[in-house]
C-alpha cells in the first residue's frame, strides 16, 4: 500500500471519529469479532509469526500495559473510550446481560484473575443462574440454573443473600461454602473475589465471581477496590440509561393513552376496537406472544371473553378474533385466582403450576409456557383480568414487566369501566326501545276510537252552553272529545286541521292521561274550554297560530301527570326531576305532547311551513310551562305593574307572552269559577291528590304540610279562603283589567269565595249560583255534527 493510500485511510478513520483506542476497546469487548476476522482474513503464515512473538511472553498473564489501563479505580480513560459504545448499546435496547459479561471480562483483566463467572437472578428472584455467552459463530446467550439463594452452599449464593463483597484467599478451606464456587473447575480454584452487582437504587441484579487458580497469588484489597469501582461505574451507567429508557417508555405510554382516549371519544361505539388497541399495546409493553382480557361476572362467579388473540398479524398488527363467548368458573385457573384475590401472578412454567386451567388451551389449540396475570381493579373490586402469555425474548416475564404492567393496568381499569358502562347504556337503550314500543302500542288510540270521533254528533243544547264561562263538562263524559273538536272548529275553522289527524291526536292524548283524582282527562278538557271561552270573547286579539297553539296546549298541559307536585318529585330524586330541574312536570307534559305529535298520523301541524311549525311549538311550550304556579306570582306582579304604569303593549312579544301565561293560569284554576256545587266537588278531587301525596310522605317519615295532611281536613275551608285571596282573586282581577270580557271569571270566583266564607261560618251552602244564560233544557236535544261551520 502506498503512503498516499495509507494517509487517506487514516484520515477517513479520523473523520468517522474512530481511534486506535476505541478500536482496541471494541475488540476487547468483542473478542469473537477478532477471532472471526483472523480465521477468515489472516493467512496461516501471519498467525505463525504472531505465535512466535507471543511465546516470548507469559501465556496466562495480561500485559502490564493492558492491566494498568484497567487498574485505575476511577476508570480514567476506559470510561471515555467505552462510554459512547455502552450508551449506544443500551439506547438501542442491547442485552444488559451480555454487556455486563463483557465488562466483567475487562474487570478480569484489571484484577489479573484467571477466570470469572457472572450470575443473574432466576425467575422468582430466589435463585441464581450462571450466564453463558453466545458461541463464536452462532447460538444465543443462556442462563444455566446454579442453585437457590441461601447460605451454606456456594460463595455466590452467600453474597447474593448478604449483598456484601467477599474476598476469600482459600475457598476450599472456608466452611461457609461447602460447595465452593459450584463451578466445574472449582477444584482448581483457590482465591475468590465475589461482588454483588447492585443498581443505583439498591436492587440486586447479579453476582460477579472472580477467581485465581492454585499456586497463584491471592486477591488483595487493591483488586477488590478496582473491581468495586468498575462495577459501580457500570451499575450507574446502566441505571442511568435504564432511567432514560423508563422515561421514554413513560412518554410512549402517555402518547398511547392520549391516542386511546382520542379513539374512544371519537368513536365511542367501537368498544371492541378500543380493547384491541389496549391489548396490542399491552403485548408490546411486556413483549408477550399472546394477550387475553377476561371480564368478571360477579353475579354468576365466572370469567368470560369473546375477543381472542389468534397469533396472526395483518400489516404488522396482531389480529383479534371475535368469537362465541367462552365462560369458566372464577374458581378455576390462574386468571380465576387473580380475579378472586386481586393479586398479580407471574408464572414461569404454566403447566407445572397446579392452578393453571388448561381448558382455554384446549379450546384455542395454543400451548401456554409462562403467564403474567394482572387484575383490573375499579372502585376496589376486580372487574377484569389481563393475561399476558409466553414471553418472546427471555424465558419468562421479569419484575420490570410486572412494574410496567401495573402502571398500564390502571388505564385498563378505566377503559374496561367505560366499556362496561357503555354496554349497560346500550342494554338500557334496548330495554328503553322495547318499552317505548310497548308504551306506544298501549298509548295510541285504536282505529275504532278515532273513527268513532269522526262520526260523532254534538247535541245542539251543548253547543249553546259551551259558550258560557261557567259551563260544566262533567255530565257529558262520553262527549268530551267531541266537545274539543267542536271548540277547535268554532275557534279556528273546520279546515284548520285534517279531521282524521285531529281525531287521532285527541283520542291518543286522552289515552295518555292517567287515572288520578284531579289532573286527568276531565281537567284537560275543562281547561281547554275556559281558553276557548276567553278566545271567543276576545275575538280578533289573537292570531290563528296562537288560537291553535293555546287550545292544544290546554288539552295537553297535564299529559301523563302522576298526581304528585314538582316539589315532591325533586325532594325524593324522581327520575323526572333529574331530567328537568325546573318546572319538572310542565316540561314533561310538553315533551309528551311533542311525542304524540311525532307519532304516525298524529301530526296535526303537518300542513304548516317549517317556520310556522317552530312558532306553534314554541307557543305550546311557553303556554304549558306557564301553568307552573311557581312562575305565576312573578308574572302577575310584572303585568300588574305594566298595566298600572300604562306600559303594557300587546304588540310587544314579551308582553304578549306574559299575558298568555296569565291566561293559562286562569284556565288552569278555572274550577274556582264554576257553579258552587261543581267548585266544591272539584275541590274534593284536588284534596284527594294532595292527601295521597301526604300519605306517601308519611310513609317515608316526613310530616307533610297541612294542605296535604288528611288528618287536617277540617282546615280545608280556611285553606281555600287563603288560596282565593292570595292566588285566584288577584289572577282574575289582573286578567279582567287586561282583557275586560273575562270579567265573568272574576265575578264567579268572588261568588265562590263568599261560599267558602259561609262554610267557615257554618251556614248552609246547598244552592246554585245564578249565572248568565238559559237554564238547562229538559226537552230532547237537537243533534248537531261536531264539524260546525263558522
From Swiss-Prot:
Comp. bias regions, Basic and acidic residues: 780-790
Domain PDEase: 446-763
Region (Disordered): 768-790
Induction text: Down-regulated by the expression of a huntingtin (HD) gene with an expanded polyglutamine repeat prior to the onset of neurological symptoms related to Huntington disease.
Residues bound to a divalent metal cation 1: 523, 557-558, 668
Binding positions (3',5'-cyclic GMP): 519, 720
Compartment(s): Cytoplasm, Cytosol
SMART domains per UniProt: GAF (SM00065), HDc (SM00471)
GO MF entries: 3',5'-cGMP-stimulated cyclic-nucleotide phosphodiesterase activity; 3',5'-cyclic-AMP phosphodiesterase activity; 3',5'-cyclic-GMP phosphodiesterase activity; 3',5'-cyclic-nucleotide phosphodiesterase activity; cAMP binding; cGMP binding; metal ion binding
Cofactor detail note: Binds 2 divalent metal cations per subunit. Site 1 may preferentially bind zinc ions, while site 2 has a preference for magnesium and/or manganese ions.
Catalytic reaction equation(s): a nucleoside 3',5'-cyclic phosphate + H2O = a nucleoside 5'-phosphate + H(+); 3',5'-cyclic AMP + H2O = AMP + H(+); 3',5'-cyclic GMP + H2O = GMP + H(+)
Top-level division of the source organism's lineage: Eukaryota
Recorded metabolic or biological pathway in which this protein acts: Purine metabolism; 3',5'-cyclic AMP degradation; AMP from 3',5'-cyclic AMP: step 1/1; Purine metabolism; 3',5'-cyclic GMP degradation; GMP from 3',5'-cyclic GMP: step 1/1
Tissue expression per record: Detected in striatum (at protein level). Detected in testis and brain.
Its EC number(s): 3.1.4.17
Binding site for a divalent metal cation 2: 558
Keyword Membrane: no
Positions of the catalytic residues: 519
Function: Plays a role in signal transduction by regulating the intracellular concentration of cyclic nucleotides. Can hydrolyze both cAMP and cGMP, but has higher affinity for cAMP and is more efficient with cAMP as substrate. May play a critical role in regulating cAMP and cGMP levels in the striatum, a region of the brain that contributes to the control of movement and cognition.
Quaternary structure, from the entry: Homodimer.
Family to which the UniProt record says this protein belongs: Belongs to the cyclic nucleotide phosphodiesterase family.
Protein name, per record: cAMP and cAMP-inhibited cGMP 3',5'-cyclic phosphodiesterase 10A
Organism from which the protein derives: Mus musculus
Source lineage: Eukaryota, Metazoa, Chordata, Craniata, Vertebrata
Amino acid at each position: 500500500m502506498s503512503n498516499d493510500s495509507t494517509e487517506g485511510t487514516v484520515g477517513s478513520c479520523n473523520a468517522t471519529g474512530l481511534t486506535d483506542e476505541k478500536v482496541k476497546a471494541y475488540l476487547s469487548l468483542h473478542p469473537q469479532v477478532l477471532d472471526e476476522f483472523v480465521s477468515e482474513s489472516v493467512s496461516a503464515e501471519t498467525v505463525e509469526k504472531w505465535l512466535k512473538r507471543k511465546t516470548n511472553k507469559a501465556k496466562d498473564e495480561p500485559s502490564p500495559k493492558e492491566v494498568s489501563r484497567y487498574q485505575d479505580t476511577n476508570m480514567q480513560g476506559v470510561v471515555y473510550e467505552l462510554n459512547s459504545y455502552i450508551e449506544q448499546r443500551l439506547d438501542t435496547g442491547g442485552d444488559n446481560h451480555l454487556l455486563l459479561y463483557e465488562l466483567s471480562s475487562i474487570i478480569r483483566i484489571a484484577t489479573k484473575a484467571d477466570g470469572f463467572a457472572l450470575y443473574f437472578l432466576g425467575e422468582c428472584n430466589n435463585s441464581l443462574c450462571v450466564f453463558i455467552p453466545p458461541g463464536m459463530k452462532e447460538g444465543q446467550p443462556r442462563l444455566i440454573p446454579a442453585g437457590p439463594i441461601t447460605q451454606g452452599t456456594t460463595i455466590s449464593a452467600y453474597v447474593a443473600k448478604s449483598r456484601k463483597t467477599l474476598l476469600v484467599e482459600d475457598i476450599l478451606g472456608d466452611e461457609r461454602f461447602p460447595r465452593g464456587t459450584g463451578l466445574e473447575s472449582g477444584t482448581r480454584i483457590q482465591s475468590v473475589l465475589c461482588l454483588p452487582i447492585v443498581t443505583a437504587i439498591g436492587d440486586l441484579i447479579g453476582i460477579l465471581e472472580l477467581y485465581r487458580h492454585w499456586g497463584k497469588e491471592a486477591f488483595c484489597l487493591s483488586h477488590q477496590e478496582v473491581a468495586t469501582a468498575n462495577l459501580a461505574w457500570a451499575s450507574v451507567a446502566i441505571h442511568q440509561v435504564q432511567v432514560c429508557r423508563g422515561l421514554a417508555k413513560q412518554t410512549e405510554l402517555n402518547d398511547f393513552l392520549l391516542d386511546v382516549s382520542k379513539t374512544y371519544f371519537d368513536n365511542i361505539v367501537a368498544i371492541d376496537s378500543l380493547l384491541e388497541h389496549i391489548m396490542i399495546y399491552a403485548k408490546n409493553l411486556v413483549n408477550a406472544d399472546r394477550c387475553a382480557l377476561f371480564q368478571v361476572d360477579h353475579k354468576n362467579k365466572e370469567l368470560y371473553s369473546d375477543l381472542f388473540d389468534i397469533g396472526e398479524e395483518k400489516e404488522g398488527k396482531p389480529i383479534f378474533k371475535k368469537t362465541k363467548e367462552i365462560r369458566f368458573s372464577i374458581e378455576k385457573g390462574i386468571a380465576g385466582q387473580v380475579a378472586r384475590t386481586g393479586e398479580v401472578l407471574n408464572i414461569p412454567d404454566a403447566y407445572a403450576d397446579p392452578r393453571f386451567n388448561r381448558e382455554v388451551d384446549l379450546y384455542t389449540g395454543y400451548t401456554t409456557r409462562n403467564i403474567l396475570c394482572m387484575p383490573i381493579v375499579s372502585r376496589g373490586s376486580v372487574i377484569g383480568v389481563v393475561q399476558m402469555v409466553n414471553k418472546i425474548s427471555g424465558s419468562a416475564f421479569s419484575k420490570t414487566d410486572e412494574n410496567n404492567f401495573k402502571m398500564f393496568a390502571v388505564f385498563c381499569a378505566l377503559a374496561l369501566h367505560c366499556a362496561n358502562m357503555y354496554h349497560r347504556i346500550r342494554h338500557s337503550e334496548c330495554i328503553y326501545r322495547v318499552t317505548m314500543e310497548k308504551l306506544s302500542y298501549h298509548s295510541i288510540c285504536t282505529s275504532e276510537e278515532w273513527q268513532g270521533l269522526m262520526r260523532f254528533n254534538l247535541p245542539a243544547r251543548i253547543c249553546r252552553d259551551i259558550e258560557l264561562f261557567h259551563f260544566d263538562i262533567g255530565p257529558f263524559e262520553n262527549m268530551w272529545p267531541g266537545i274539543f273538536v267542536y271548540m277547535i272548529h268554532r275557534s279556528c275553522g273546520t279546515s284548520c286541521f285534517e279531521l282524521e289527524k285531529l281525531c287521532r291526536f285527541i283520542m291518543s292524548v286522552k289515552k295518555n292521561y292517567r287515572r288520578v283524582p284531579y289532573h286527568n282527562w276531565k281537567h284537560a278538557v275543562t281547561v281547554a274550554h275556559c281558553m276557548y271561552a276567553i278566545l271567543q270573547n276576545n275575538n280578533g286579539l289573537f292570531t290563528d297560530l296562537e288560537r291553535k297553539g293555546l287550545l292544544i296546549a290546554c288539552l295537553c298541559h297535564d299529559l301523563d301527570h302522576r298526581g304528585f307536585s314538582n316539589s315532591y318529585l325533586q325532594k325524593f330524586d324522581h327520575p323526572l326531576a333529574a331530567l328537568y330541574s325546573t318546572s319538572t312536570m310542565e316540561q314533561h307534559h310538553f315533551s309528551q305532547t311533542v311525542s304524540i305529535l311525532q307519532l304516525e298520523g298524529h301530526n296535526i301541524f303537518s300542513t304548516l311551513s317549517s317556520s310556522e311549525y317552530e312558532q306553534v311549538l314554541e307557543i305550546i311550550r311557553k303556554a304549558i310551562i306557564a301553568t307552573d304556579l311557581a312562575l305565576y306570582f312573578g308574572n302577575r306582579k310584572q303585568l300588574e305593574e305594566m298595566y298600572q304604569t300604562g306600559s303594557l303593549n300587546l304588540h310587544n312579544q314579551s308582553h304578549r307572552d306574559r299575558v298568555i301565561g296569565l291566561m293559562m293560569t286562569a284556565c288552569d284554576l278555572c274550577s274556582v269559577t264554576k257553579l258552587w256545587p261543581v267548585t266544591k266537588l272539584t275541590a274534593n278531587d284536588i284534596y284527594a291528590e294532595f292527601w295521597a301525596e301526604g300519605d306517601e310522605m308519611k310513609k317515608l317519615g316526613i310530616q307533610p304540610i297541612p294542605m296535604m295532611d288528611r288528618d287536617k281536613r277540617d282546615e280545608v275551608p280556611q285553606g281555600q279562603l287563603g288560596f282565593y285571596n292570595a292566588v285566584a282573586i288577584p289572577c282574575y282581577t289582573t286578567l279582567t283589567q287586561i282583557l275586560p270580557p273575562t270579567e265573568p271569571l272574576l265575578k264567579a270566583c268572588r261568588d265562590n269565595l263568599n261560599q267558602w266564607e259561609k262554610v267557615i261560618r257554618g251556614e248552609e251552602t246547598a244552592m246554585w249560583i245564578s249565572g248568565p244564560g238559559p237554564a238547562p233544557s229538559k226537552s230532547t236535544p237537537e243533534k248537531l255534527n261536531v264539524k260546525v261551520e263558522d
